[in-house]
Amino acid sequence: MNRLLLLLALVLSGVAAESIRETETMDPTSMLEYESSGSFTDEVFVDEDDDDDYEDGVDYEIDSESDNDEDYSGSGDDDFDDEDNVEDEDEEETTTLGNQIPEHDFDETKTGRKFDTFNENNEIDNDIRHPAKPKTLEPSNEIPMASIGSSGFFQRTEVIVAIIAGTLVGLVVAVSFIVFLVIRRNQNGDLVKKPIYKKTSTMEV
């Protein structure tokens, strides 16, 4: 009898340990450790065209005679100098408003609308501008509340594993209880004692 109880205790402890091991949650930080595939630090790319040029022995030299152009005048003044002076004068000219107040008045800080902006047809443009949100390329670890509320209680893997483990433990306990009753009945004999003598019928008397 003691051996049976000891065997039953070992089976229950094994089932409980297995159910606890299955209900352990996963570490979310380990799921985000991915290896990037965009960088190749070990590989070195060599341009093969440069090697071909050196092997052919082609030298690209600038002809000194091409620098001497026939359009140069004897006075030493070049046409390029005149063009450079014109560009410098254009860059130095700046426009200033002075004390003039610009006609366009923007009130985007309060209402997000802009006023006094006219199109070609003298129509006021009162478009509402919404501030653009910065785009994040990296995935966030935040779980939206809508997805948490929509998922049912019995759809979680932890709940399903716990239910299965509890059912298995209940079956083991029920089977062991039935076996215990059968063994006890065989040891003690019949539960109902039979009478020693048998009563005679009244008809014979």
UniProtKB/Swiss-Prot annotation:
Residues 184-205 are cytoplasmic. Residues 26-113 are annotated as: Disordered. GO terms for biological process: cell migration; convergent extension involved in gastrulation; neural tube closure; protein localization; Wnt signaling pathway. Expressed in the animal hemisphere from the 4-cell to the blastula stage. During gastrulation, expressed in the involuting dorsal mesoderm and ectoderm. After involution, localized mainly to the anterior neuroectoderm. At later stages, expressed in the brain, branchial arches, pronephros, tailbud, and at low levels in the somites. It comes from the Eukaryota. It is a single-pass type I membrane protein. Residues 102-113 have a biased composition (Basic and acidic residues). O-glycosylated; contains both chondroitin sulfate and heparan sulfate. Ser-37, Ser-73 and Ser-75 can all be modified by either chondroitin sulfate or heparan sulfate, and the protein exists in forms that contain only chondroitin sulfate, only heparan sulfate and both chondroitin sulfate and heparan sulfate. Keywords: Developmental protein, Gastrulation, Glycoprotein, Heparan sulfate, Membrane, Proteoglycan, Signal, Transmembrane, Transmembrane helix, Wnt signaling pathway. Residues 44-94 have a biased composition (Acidic residues). Pfam families: Syndecan. This is Syndecan 4-B.
